[in-house]
């Protein structure tokens, strides 16, 4: 019986170390090396440095566009998705979420004052809301 409890305790401690909860933002370096520039070839390594644009959502008044970009860190073998907003009139782009968690599927509320999105910042993918400028994120589910 003692062996069973010991085995269970070791297993639980081991599984706890497998948690992937991130507190530090993922470092993204998408700058090309001199060799990549000189070669002028769109190699797989160069392509992995490019962000992948994902879902988009137009604001109710059509003045702003929300969209996601997934960036990759090849050294850590993982990626992260961030939410951006672009002003239609000026073309100005602002990053609304950082690289410490994956944030996806942004949607505007009816009056364009809030954004609803999915995020794994709490450890699992949940529904969140934030102000239209990216401030005051709050978990809803």
Model-derived segments and spans:
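Hydrophobic beta-strand positions that form the internal "hydrophobic ladder"
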Residues: 62-66, 96, 112-116
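A flexible loop/linker signature enriched in serine peptidases of the S9 family
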Residues: 25, 69-82, 97-103, 118-128, ...
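Conserved beta-strand position repeated once per blade in WD40 beta-propeller domains
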Residues: 55, 105-107
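C-terminal motif of bacterial Sec signal peptides marking the signal peptidase cleavage site
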Residues: 14-17
């Amino acid at each position: 019986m003692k062996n069973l409890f010991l085995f269970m305790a070791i297993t639980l401690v081991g599984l706890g170390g497998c948690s992937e909860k991130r507190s530090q933002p993922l470092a993204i370096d998408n700058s090309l090396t001199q060799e990549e520039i000189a070669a002028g070839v769109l190699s797989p390594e160069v392509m992995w440095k490019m962000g992948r644009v994902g879902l988009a959502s137009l604001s109710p008044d059509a003045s702003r566009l929300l969209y996601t970009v997934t960036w990759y860190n090849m050294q850590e073998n993982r990626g992260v998705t961030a939410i951006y907003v672009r002003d239609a009139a000026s073309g100005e782009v602002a990053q609304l979420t950082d690289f410490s968690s994956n944030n996806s599927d942004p949607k505007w509320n009816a009056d364009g004052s809030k954004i609803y999105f999915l995020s794994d910042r709490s450890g699992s993918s949940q529904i969140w809301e934030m102000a239209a400028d990216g401030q005051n994120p709050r978990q809803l589910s």
